[in-house]
Amino acid sequence: GTKRGEKTMKITGMHCENCVASVTRAINRIDGAAAKVSLKKGEAVVSYDREISNEELKKVVEDRGYHVVSIQ
């Protein structure tokens, strides 16, 4: 669909490319969301084509064992 917007999530606990892949998969599993995760910056930029709540984004990442510091 059309991109509605994007959010940047600051995430701690990612240490390697496996962590990046895990976070990417977790976010991409949300319908309408696509993530670009940077290990170096410790963040995920999430593009979405429907409204996705910060709570939903936070939950899927924290369920994998990472900590979400902020979403904006």
Range-by-range predicted roles:
Residues G1-Q72:
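Flexible metal-binding regulatory segments at protein termini and peripheral loops
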